[in-house]
Structure formats: C-alpha cells, structure tokens
C-alpha cells in the first residue's frame, strides 16, 4: 500500500467550508475499498479481510501488532506486513481512517431529492413525484432526443417501458452504435444515472440568465415563483464556485465513504452476543446489494431483475443516509427503526447537542445542600470525603513533593486510608483554589457560581443563605453539583469573575439578588419596628434621650431599653449635600442597632425595614462603597436578621387571622346588586354577556374592599405586631392574595379552558364567599379544586415550553458580543416615561439609567449642560432629569448600533451585573437571552402558589385626570345627546379623538389618551379640572354605532334567516336580532337614518351586532343603533403570559389580525367583492389605498372619517409586521418591548429594556429584497443589511450593456465600469463600427424584515450554529450546495469545534499577546534602542 499524506486537520483553523464531496475527494481520503459485508470472524473474533472492520484498510486492532501476528512491538513502527498487509501502528488510527464502497451504478443522495425543496428537482425543473419515478426506475427520461426530435420527442420527456421499446425498435440499427456525444444519437435513461447525465450537462450561467429573464417577464405569478425557486438553487451553485469546486452532478454518488470502525463499534457483550452500531447493518445491506448487482450484471441477468436490484440498492443507500424520511424504513428485530447518519446528527440525542455542545465533565461530584448560616458570602461547606476525592491528584502530588511517599500508587493508598497528613495537605491545597457550584436547571449565569470551599464533616454541601435566590435553591432536598477548575486560567476566572461575592447584582435588571429574605428580613423588620407603651404593655426605655449609639446598645444589652422603644439619639448623619453632620433624631432603639452595620457613607437609616427597602439599601451600599464592603454589610445583616428572628419568636396561630366584621355587610350588598343585574337580564335590558361581565365586576370590587378592610384590621391588631401581618408586610412570606384567602374571601375562581383565548366563562361567576379560617362548604370546595389543579397541571406542562423559549433566545442571540468601543452612529432611540393604564410603569430615570446620551442634554430651567453626548447617564443625572421634568431623551441603543459584527459598548451602555460600562468581549446576547428566559420559567411556576384564585383584569370604562390641569382635545367631533340615565351630555363621534391634559403654568403635557368613539363627555374643551375628575366614560362591554342626525330609521337587507337571526333567551323570554354572515354575498345589512330636511346617512352593520332599534321608528342624534359585544374579563395568569411572550418573539401574526391604514386620510366605502368590503383611504395629497375587509369583521371606521396611518380599519390585534412597514423599526421595537413588559410586569418581574432590544436587533437584522435591480440578489431573498449594502455598492457608477453593437468583447446584460464602456466605444468609433449602448446599473430595493427568533436562528451566518439548533439535515444540505463558509465568529460554533469562545480573554485580539515581566520588557526596549544607536553610528 502506498504511503500517503496525513489527512488529519490541524486544530488551529479559523474557518470551515462545507461542500459536496466529489468522488475523487472520497477516494483520496479512503484507505481501501470495502467489498465484503462481513464484520468479524465468529471463531477468532478478528476482523475479516476486505470487510467492514478490515485491519488492512482501517489499521490494527491492537497497538503495534499486525493481523497475523508476524510483527509485534513498537520497533516495527510503520512497516506493512508482507503476509497480511496490515500497517504496524497505533490502534487509534481506527478512529480516523476511512474506507469506501464503489457502487456499480450511480445513486442519488436522499438529502438532495427527498427533503423539500428538492435540490435536484429544482435544478432540473422536475416535480418531486416525477423525480421519484426516475430514481426508482419506473420511467425512462429522454436525455438526448437525437433523430427522434423530428417526431416531436424532446429533452426531458418521460417514457413508459413500452414507449421506450417501441422507439428503440423504430430506430435505425446504426443509431445505437453512435458515440454518446453525437447529437444524432437517441438516448433515454432511468435511475440516478439519468440524473447524473443531465446534471453534468447543465450550464449554470446560461440557466441562470434564462430563469432571471423568465422571473422578470413571465405574466403568470405561479411560473415566476417557480422560476425564482429554481434560480435560488442555481445561484447557490454559482456562488459556491467562487470559494470551492462544487458540481451539481456530485449530488449523485458513485462512491460512498465508509466511516472509521471505531465510530461505529462492535462491542462483545456477556454470553457471546455482540452489540453493534446500526450503521454497520445499514452498510452491510448496501454492500450485499451492490455485490449482488455486480454478479447479476456479470451473468447478464434480464433487465427486470436488474432494475429491481438497482432500485433496492438506491433504497439501501437512502436508508444509510436518512432512515427516518422513507416510507419503508429499515428496522431491526423488535421493529426498532435503525439509526442512520441523519438520525445520529439531529435532535437532542444527536451528535451536535449530546456530544459536542453538552459534554460530561471530569472532577465533579454532587450532593444534597443544607444551609450554612455562619459562612461568609464567598464560602461554601464541602464535605471532607468529597473534597479528598475531587482534589486527589493535587494531594498525590503534594505527598510525593514532601517525600512522604515515593510512588503514585502508594500515595493513592494513603489518600484512600484518609490518614491525618492527607487532611493537612488538603487544607493547603484548598487555599485559593475555588470550586464551582451548579444547581440544575441552569437558567442564567448565576446558576453557576464559585466559592472558596471550607472542609466540613458530614455528607451534605453547605450553602450560604444569601445565594439561594440566585440559584433558586431551597433546602427541601435540592442537590447541587461541584466542579473543580483545574488550569490556572480557570482558577483565575473563578476567583475574579465567578466568585459569589462578585455577583451581588442581577444581570436582568441591575437590582441586588443577594438580599436577606425569609426569616432574616422578618428579624430585621421586627428589630426596626416601633411600639408605643400601653397600660397593659409598657415599653422599657420609651422617650429616653441618649448621647450616642453606643449608649443605646448598652441599654439594650443590660435590659434597660426595649428594641421597640421610641428614643432620641445623637448620631452622625449625612445632609443633602452629603456632608457629615451630628444631630439628634427621633428613632427606635432597634434601628440604632441596625445602623451599626451600615457604612457611614449612607448616613443614618431611620426606616422600618422591608425586603424592598433593604434591596434599595443594598444597591446603594454596593454603589457607594464597592463590592468588598457590600459583602461585609450583607454578611452582618444576615447574622443580625437570623438572631432577631430567633429572639422575636414569631409564630403562626389561627387566632392571628382576623376576619373583618364588615365583610358580611359588603357581601349582602353585593348580593343585592347581583340580583338587580339578574333582574335587568330577565327583563331583557341587557344581554347574557353583559350580565356575566357585570357580575364578575361586582364580585371583583367587593373582594378588593374586603381585602382593604382585612389589611386595616391586621395592621391595627397589637400595634402591627400581628405575626401574619409582619410576615406579609415585611415581605418575608405570603402575599396579600394569600392573606386575603385566609381571612377575607377566596373570591372568584378560574376554571380550566380548552382554548387559550378567553371565551365567556373563563371565571366561574359564583365566588367563594368563605375564607380558609371559616372553612369552605362542599360546593365551594369543589369549585376550589378546579383552580388548584389547573395550577399544578400548568406547572408540569409549561416548564418545558419555558425551557424551549430560553433555548431559542440563546440561539438567536449567541453571537451578539461587544466587539468595539464606539460604532460612531448618529442615530438612537427616544425614551419617555412608560405608562401602563394611567400608572407610571417605569419612570424616565429608571429607563435611561446606565444608557449613553445621544445628544448634549441641557437643564430646561437654568440651561446648564447636564450630560455631554456620548456620556453615561448616572443615577444622580437620571434623578435630576426626572425632577426637572424633561419628558423625553434620545439615547444610544443596540437597535441603531452600526457595528458590523456584534455591537459596541456605547450603544449597549451599562453592564447591569457590575454597574459599570460594559467591557469589550462581553457576551451580551447570551445574558439578554438568559435574563428573558429565566423569569419565563419562573412565570410558569408562579400559579402554583395562589391555588387557582382568579384575578380578573379590571375593564377600562372611563378616563380620569391624573393631575390638575387644562383639557385639550384633538380631532374633536361631538353631538349633544341624552345618555341612558337621562343626563344631557356630549358624545364623541370621531374615531381618532385624543385628549391631552396640560399643566396650566408651562403647557407641559401631563397625560395623553385616546378617547374611544361613543364616549360620553363630562367636561368641556379647555376646562380646568382637578386630579381624579372623570373626563369621559363609555360602555366597556359593547362597541356601538351612533347616529349623528335625528330622523327615521330604514333597514336595508336586514332579513330574518338571511342576514340576521333572532336569538331567543329561554330565561328572559326576550328575542334579540343578531346580524349573521349571509350566504348571499350581495346582501349587505345597513341602516339609513333619514333626516327631516331630506339628508340621509347610511350605516353599515357588522356581523355579531345586536339591533336595538326597529325599522320605521324615530331616533334622536347621538343614540345607538346597534351594540357589538366586546370580549372581556379574561383571567390573567401566566398561561396567557408564556404563549404571549412566544407569540411576540416568534413575530407571529395574530389569529385575527386587524387591517391597518398605511396613510393618513379620509375613508370612503367601496363595493363588496368576493365576501369582502372594499375600503378606500385617500390622503390630502391624492394618494389612494384600497383595503379589503372580510364582511365577518367589525369595521371600526365609517364613511368620511379622517384616520391616521397605523389606525386599525377593522377589529383584531395589530400584527407586528404591519407596524414595521407602516411606522418603522423603532415603533415595532417599542410595541414588542411594551407588550412583553406588560406580561412580565403582571408577575412583578423586572427586565431591563436593553435585553429585549438585543433580541429585537437580531429579529430585525435582515432585509427582504423587493426588486433585485442588476444585483445578484433574487426578489424575495432574505439578506443581511451589510451584504445588501455591499451588493449595491458594487454597482456604483457601473453600466449595464443593453446593445453590444459591433463589440466582440461585451455581451448584452454585462455589467461594466463607465471607463471600460468609454474605452470600448472609442475603439469601435475609430473602426467606424456601431457603438455599445448601455444604461446605469440599477441597485436593488429591499425592506426590513421582521423574523421570528426560530427563523432568525436558522438564518444565522454560521451553518454550524444553525445545524445544531434545528432542521439539521436541511441546514447542512443547503449549506453544502452553497459551499458555505463558517468563519467561527459566534459562541456555539466555537464550542462545537473545540476552540476558545470569542468573548472575554478568548477574543482573537488577545490570543497573540505575549505575557512576561515588566523588567524583561524594559530591558528588551533598552537593548533595542542601544542596538539602533550603534547602527546609526
């Protein structure tokens, strides 16, 4: 056998190109042909020669020993045995040497014709069905008509066997003897051979220009789509040619590679049986069929038998490559489907996710965790035995170094005996050697933290109580894993970055995570809570005055002063300017104790401590005095909290639960209201829907009132020292919801729903009036079980969804890394206060904190410069900006960052987990994904605790003034009317009325709201109103259509059974007319109101509307004609939440999207066409747009309404993609961020906007080409912004030839520079020939495309990352055709190929650094200078 070059790949490569393998390249890599299906000899257990495990091809089974045993030992290295032909080498070569199988006939690769879109099919223009007929030997295809072309037979015609034989009979005999290249010869083939023949003859360049021409000029939409589909594949091959040889005919194989035997092992089991990889079975089938076919051809078997055998060989190769797609899959015994190459790659158990992205780790252990209250924040307790096992190699080395033992073996024995010297050494080894603790599920980066281990007795790991929040751990049997960082770099990283004391802040929102909770907070609350003396309970030391804090502490220690006593103390404090002052304060003795531990930079904290307050204090401590003192503070506070909780002795008794006495009165009153609503319903005044909604509202209100009284009673009980109230109020345990159920009323319960959208009856309308103290009756208990079980079922089902959401988020954002300081962009986003239902959800100071200002910001009052452009907005500046009333600020944002790869630090701003500006090399994408995904998982587990009590979303039915101010209406159109209660009011009849509340002094806008159509006004334009005053109100349960004139009613096309049906309500005996969708599309129900002076207005009536007027009756202006019920009162829990988050990130269009106007203009109704109403919007400058609204939809606009761009014409949810196209990327980002924040805010989860922005940046990173111009892009193609810009830049100042004239150099359609054109024309002019005509090259036009996160992950630049995410086979086959290059720039692809990830110190710029001593460097510089000086002389 020839010596051959080493085919192993060096590990320091920087990119990977994937392409189709040519037969030559497979042969070049192969060590020999496998011709026998045998594996090993059943007697000797040695591999059979020429078989699948052959040693001659793949290398020896034992190190340095040939097959026959003639050469043994390393000294014969490299010799090839003359008897058996096996090279004497190591056995590990069996992991890398490949073989091959030479097939008798070509075979099509299943990936390229089975998986849709079929690559071979598109290239040749065959549908999949026809392709299958060729490949599986059912039809012949004409590949060269030859002389039969005259008889109408053409290229690519299909022939049955009879037709083929008839043609052969009719041919002249010599025709078949001609050479294949002779155009007169008739050739028809079947099977992959035909495809190979046709693919090899394709001229891609010609085909490309033909298809482009067709896509441009064809009138049929279908044929154009077809042409573009084919063009995509053609262009992929043409593009690949620029990087690597890639021929279409290589999609058909003549040679199959056989992978190394160690990668498909055959393992002997006990009892003489063997376990084998499925690939061996699949390979055997291929070899057996190939050999049989060879024999059949040799003995000249009949065509029928040959054809059947060829088909079977094709199927065998299909199942080797992909056994899951085929109808007739190959199965092992017990009907288990064999795992083919595709199955080995894809899925969670596939090569990518199981072995490359998730490896198992050595030097690790796991154990149960228990609390370690006396540990420092950076410490954890590690069981001795565990430590001895984990650090064994280190101990062995020290034992040998100290000369205690001589060999490793004896050292091992010593460690196993656990002699005292071992513990001594272990103590030393552990100094400065941190360990990592990890709690599954690892949802964010704080689930793995480093600690300094302390050796402890016992078998459980001790964990510091403050890190439980980050790990989401509790001590009910949780287990944690321990990992040992081995290398110096790993130890440095663990100690400097991952140590628990460095991870106090939460990267999702910048608030401290390591904050005392549970009993610690209860102890601190108890300590800082004051109590006044009463005759029964005198408080020691009340009213005393102390000279210093020390005196107070002596008083407490000696029992003279109670910790709850109100006292006066002289203390050091900070004034407004931050200067230290001394003064006397009224405080509580316990607070003086607490302040002993507070850094003096914060001054004296004179407040009752709750968990929120303590979180705020911790964050101030961290900011003002740094990490190490913050850690010290937390440890002190932890001990103080535990000590006082133990001293307080807070218990939980039945009598601590107080039931408010007023509860029963409130319930009776509510019962009366409910009866009144029921009466109204029975009299037919309201619909069933309204009745349900009103009842739910009554009970929701009563429940809230009862809760308020309950809280008051608890607070007044024992001066607020009621133990349940203390637990709840301090934030230690229990929520208002839970306490309400104990002592108030359980209230309304949710019931399980089949569908997600709330249909009527999402909430059971009979509330549970009892609480847990009084006890529930049987019916109430039964209703309760609904909710409780729903909670448990949700938890079980939704956790997987949340995990999958996190996985998709990480995948889409994994390559977002900060790569440069400043991208220099001039764009940014405008940030204002975020308002949610009249309340400030997030103030402008919270939203701008840690961002970089885009422009200089000046104080509006003094005109002083507050922040320079490009400077960070700090806490102080943010607070000041809010105080002076600046309403909006432009800041840098990830969305507008123009860094080509990754993002820049200025656009990102502050790193929330450190409170400083983000560094270069931070993996901000992964942090963003974790920050959004981690609460997602928490959201699913949240329902579990409330036990299914439903809280309904209050329905908005009025607008109240948020401040005192002057009213200003915009687009204001009203008519006078009387409301149902008989009051004289104005009613709004314009669609886009806005109300603003202005500050009378400086005309600042205090509130800005949309006023809905049909709202009754309580105020006048320009009126000065007070805070809380009602501006307008409307019916929250029904949309209405009002008449704007007095007159008589006339019905059109309102016919029973055709356009409306009468709904008979059995309980009330009333009938209602409800408009239905008519089968007869010409009938369009409408009502005309004829005025007395002859004018008439026509109103179109939508489906589901309920008529409240009769034909021929009189009506007054401003009265409703119909009511259209709105669907409201949905229960709000996270099941609504998680699917909503997914829907937003996947950018899915809602199930019933609203139709939105793209321009400002006046509405006119058009005719009805095909079940849709045409609606025109015409702007003032004459632009006209047409919209088709299905008749089943409620149209929100009437004739002649003036509406603005983005206003919905029909009801439904707005789709994010229409927001993008109408209002632009910033609007869609605001919409998605606002909707997401609303879901998370309901659960009390705070996520900083910048994380959401990072994900949205990835969703908006691509463009969709609309017109390709003269570029190589295709219409409808998705390209990245930078690729698109480059493509267009290449056409700058270029010309396109439209008539080549007499030029022999240029051809039509060629793109050339203006200079080349000028030169060519000069030459032609000189020779007096016709000149070349050319036009300017047209650039492509594209628009932003909003992709869902799954789509964006699959469209990432790196094919390795995409393949490891989803659709592995499709991604890889498309990448191979494109000859894709992966430059390994993201995290995932580097993990897969085993490189350092390009973040932090793994950035390429650091890899070439040389590290040494400063002295050496200075000496080197000095010697260089000396050398230079001597050279000059």
Curated annotation (Swiss-Prot):
Binds 1 Mg(2+) ion per subunit. Mg(2+) binds at residues 474, 476, 478. SMART domains: RPOLA_N (SM00663). Its cofactor is Mg(2+); Zn(2+). GO terms for cellular component: DNA-directed RNA polymerase complex. GO terms for biological process: DNA-templated transcription. Its EC number is 2.7.7.6. Zn(2+) 2 binds at residues 823, 897, 904, 907. It holds the Pfam family RNA_pol_Rpb1_1. DNA-dependent RNA polymerase catalyzes the transcription of DNA into RNA using the four ribonucleoside triphosphates as substrates. HAMAP family: RNApol_bact_RpoC. The RNAP catalytic core consists of 2 alpha, 1 beta, 1 beta' and 1 omega subunit. When a sigma factor is associated with the core the holoenzyme is formed, which can initiate transcription. This is DNA-directed RNA polymerase subunit beta'. It comes from Amoebophilus asiaticus (strain 5a2). The lineage of its organism: Bacteria, Pseudomonadati, Bacteroidota, Cytophagia, Cytophagales. The gene is rpoC.
């Amino acid at each position: 056998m020839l010596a051959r070059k080493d085919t192993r790949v060096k590990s320091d490569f920087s990119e990977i190109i994937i392409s189709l393998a040519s037969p030559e390249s497979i042969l070049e890599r192969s060590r020999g042909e496998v011709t026998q299906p045998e594996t090993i000899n059943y007697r000797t257990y040695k591999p059979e020669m020429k078989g699948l495990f052959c040693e001659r091809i793949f290398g020896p089974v034992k190190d340095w020993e040939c097959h026959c045993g003639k050469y043994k030992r390393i000294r014969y290295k490299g010799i090839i045995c003359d008897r058996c032909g096996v090279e004497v080498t190591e056995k590990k070569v069996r992991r890398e040497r490949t073989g091959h199988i030479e097939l008798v006939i070509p075979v099509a690769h299943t990936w390229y014709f089975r998986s849709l879109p079929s690559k071979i099919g598109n290239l040749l223009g065959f549908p999949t069905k026809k392709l299958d007929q060729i490949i599986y030997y059912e039809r012949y295809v004409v590949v060269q008509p030859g002389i039969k072309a005259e008889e109408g037979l053409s290229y690519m015609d299909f022939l049955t066997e009879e037709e083929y034989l008839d043609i052969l009979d009719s041919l002249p005999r010599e025709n078949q003897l001609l050479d294949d290249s002779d155009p007169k010869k008739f050739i028809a083939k079947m099977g992959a051979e035909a495809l190979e023949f046709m693919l090899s003859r394709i001229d891609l360049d010609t085909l490309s220009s033909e298809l482009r021409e067709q896509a441009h000029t064809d009138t049929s939409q279908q044929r154009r789509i077809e042409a573009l589909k084919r063009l995509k594949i053609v262009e992929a091959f043409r593009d690949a040619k620029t990087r690597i040889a890639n021929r279409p005919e290589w999609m058909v194989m003549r040679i199959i590679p056989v992978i190394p035997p160690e990668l498909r092992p055959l393992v002997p089991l006990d009892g003489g049986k063997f376990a084998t990889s499925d690939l061996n079975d699949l390979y055997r089938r291929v070899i057996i069929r190939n050999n049989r076919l060879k024999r059949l051809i040799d003995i000249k078997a009949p065509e029928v038998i040959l054809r059947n055998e060829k088909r079977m060989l094709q199927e065998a190769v299909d199942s080797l490559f992909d056994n899951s797609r085929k109808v007739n899959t190959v199965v092992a015994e017990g009907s288990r489907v064999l795992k083919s190459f595709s199955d080995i790659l894809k899925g969670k158990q596939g090569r990518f996710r199981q072995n490359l992205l998730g490896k198992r780790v050595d030097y690790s252990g796991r154990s149960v965790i228990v609390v370690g209250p006396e540990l420092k924040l950076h410490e954890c307790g590690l069981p001795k035995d565990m430590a001895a096992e984990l650090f064994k190699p280190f101990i062995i080395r020290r034992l040998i170094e100290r000369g205690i033992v001589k060999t490793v073996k004896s050292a091992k024995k010593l460690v196993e005996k656990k002699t005292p010297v071992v513990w001594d050494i272990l103590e030393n080894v552990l100094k400065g050697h941190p360990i990592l603790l990890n709690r599954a599920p690892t949802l964010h980066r704080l689930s793995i933290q480093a600690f300094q281990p302390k050796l402890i007795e016992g078998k459980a790991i001790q964990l510091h109580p403050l890190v439980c929040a980050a790990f989401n751990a509790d001590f009910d049997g949780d287990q944690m894993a321990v990992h040992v960082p081995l290398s110096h770099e790993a130890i440095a990283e663990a100690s400097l970055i991952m140590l628990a004391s460095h991870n106090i802040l939460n990267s999702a929102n910048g608030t401290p995570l390591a904050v005392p909770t549970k009993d610690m907070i209860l102890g601190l609350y108890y300590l800082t809570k004051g109590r006044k003396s009463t005759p029964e309970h005198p408080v020691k030391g009340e009213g005393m005055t102390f000279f210093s804090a020390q005196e107070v502490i002596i008083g407490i220690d000696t029992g003279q002063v109670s910790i709850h006593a109100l006292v006066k103390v002289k203390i050091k404090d900070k004034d407004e300017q931050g200067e230290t002052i001394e003064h006397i304060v009224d405080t509580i003795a316990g607070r003086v104790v607490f302040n002993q531990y507070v850094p003096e930079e914060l001054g004296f904290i004179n407040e009752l401590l709750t968990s929120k307050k303590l979180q705020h204090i911790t964050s101030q401590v961290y900011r003002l005095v740094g990490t190490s003192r913050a850690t010290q503070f937390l440890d002190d506070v932890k001990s103080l909290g535990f000590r006082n909780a133990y001293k307080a002795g807070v218990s939980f008794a039945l009598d601590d639960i107080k039931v408010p006495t007023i509860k029963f009165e409130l319930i009776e009153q509510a019962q009366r209201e409910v009866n009144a609503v029921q009466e109204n319903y029975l009299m037919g005044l309201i619909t069933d829907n309204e009745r349900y909604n009103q009842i739910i509202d009554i009970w929701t209100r009563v429940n809230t009132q009862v809760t308020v009284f309950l809280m008051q009673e608890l607070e007044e009980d024992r001066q607020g020292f009621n133990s349940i109230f203390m637990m709840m109020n301090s934030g230690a345990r229990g929520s208002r919801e839970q306490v309400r159920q104990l002592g108030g009323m359980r209230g309304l319960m949710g019931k399980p729903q089949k569908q997600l959208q709330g249909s009527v009856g999402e909430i059971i309308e009979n509330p549970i009036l009892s609480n847990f103290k009084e006890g529930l009756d049987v019916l109430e208990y039964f209703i309760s079980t609904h909710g409780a079980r729903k909670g448990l079922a949700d938890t079980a089902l939704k956790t997987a969804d949340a995990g999958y959401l996190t996985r998709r988020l990480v995948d889409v954002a994994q390559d977002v890394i900060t790569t440069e300081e400043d991208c220099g962009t001039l764009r940014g986003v405008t940030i204002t206060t975020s308002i949610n239902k009249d309340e400030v959800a997030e103030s402008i100071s919270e939203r701008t904190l840690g961002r970089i200002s885009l422009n200089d910001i000046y104080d509006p009052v003094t005109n002083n410069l507050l922040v320079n452009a490009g400077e960070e907005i700090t806490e102080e500046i943010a607070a000041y900006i809010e105080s002076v009333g600046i309403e909006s600020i432009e800041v840098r944002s990830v969305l507008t960052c123009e860094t080509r790869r990754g993002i820049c630090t200025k656009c990102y701003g502050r790193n929330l987990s450190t409170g400083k500006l983000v560094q270069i090399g931070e993996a901000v994408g992964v942090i963003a994904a974790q920050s959004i995904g981690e609460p997602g998982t928490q959201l699913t587990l949240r329902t579990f605790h409330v036990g299914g009590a439903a809280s309904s979303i209050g329905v908005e039915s009025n607008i109240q003034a948020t401040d005192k101010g002057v009213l200003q209406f915009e687009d204001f159109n009203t008519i006078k009317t009387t409301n149902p209660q008989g009051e004289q009011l104005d009613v709004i009849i314009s669609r886009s009325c806005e109300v603003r509340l202005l500050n009378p002094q400086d005309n600042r806008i205090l509130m800005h709201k949309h006023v809905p159509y049909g709202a009754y006004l309580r105020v006048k334009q320009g009126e000065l109103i007070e805070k809380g005053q009602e501006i307008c109100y409307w019916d929250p349960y029904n949309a209405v259509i009002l008449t704007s004139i007095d007159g008589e009613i006339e019905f059109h096309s309102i016919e029973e059974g055709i356009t409306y049906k009468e709904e008979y309500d059995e309980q009330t005996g009333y009938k209602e007319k409800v408009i239905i969708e008519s089968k007869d599309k010409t009938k369009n129900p409408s009502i005309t109101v004829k005025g007395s002076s002859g004018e008439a207005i026509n109103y179109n009536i939508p489906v589901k509307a309920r008529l409240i007027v009769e034909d021929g009756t009189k009506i007054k202006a401003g009265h409703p004609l119909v009511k259209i019920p709105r669907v409201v009162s949905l229960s709000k829990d996270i099941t609504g939440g998680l699917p909503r988050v997914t829907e937003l990130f996947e950018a899915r269009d809602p199930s019933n999207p609203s139709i939105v106007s793209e321009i400002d203009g006046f509405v006119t109704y058009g005719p009805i066409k095909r079940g849709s109403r045409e609606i025109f919007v015409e702007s003032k400058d004459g632009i006209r747009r047409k919209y088709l609204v299905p008749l089943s939809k409620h149209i929100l606009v009437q004739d002649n309404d003036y509406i603005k761009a983005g206003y919905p014409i029909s009801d439904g949810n707005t789709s994010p993609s229409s927001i993008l196209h109408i209002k632009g990327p910033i609007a869609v980002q605001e919409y998605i961020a606002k909707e997401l924040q609303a879901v998370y805010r309901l659960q009390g989860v705070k996520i900083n906007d910048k994380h959401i922005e990072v994900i949205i940046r990835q969703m908006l990173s691509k463009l969709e080409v609309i017109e390709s111009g003269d570029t190589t892009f295709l219409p409808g193609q998705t390209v990245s912004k930078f690729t698109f810009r480059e493509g267009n830049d290449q056409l700058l100042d270029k010309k396109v030839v439209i008539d080549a004239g007499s030029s022999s150099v240029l051809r039509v359609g060629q793109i050339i520079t203006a200079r080349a054109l000028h030169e060519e024309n000069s030459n032609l002019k000189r020779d007096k020939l016709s000149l070349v005509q050319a036009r300017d090259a047209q650039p492509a036009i594209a628009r932003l495309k909003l992709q869902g996160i799954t789509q964006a992950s699959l469209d990432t630049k790196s094919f390795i990352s995409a393949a490891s995410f989803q659709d592995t086979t499709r991604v890889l086959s498309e990448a191979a055709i494109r000859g894709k290059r992966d430059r390994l720039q993201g995290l995932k692809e580097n993990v897969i190929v085993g490189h350092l990830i390009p973040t932090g110190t793994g950035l390429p710029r650091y890899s070439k650094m040389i590290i040494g001593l400063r002295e050496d460097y200075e000496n080197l510089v000095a010697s260089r200078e000396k050398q230079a000086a001597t050279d000059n002389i």
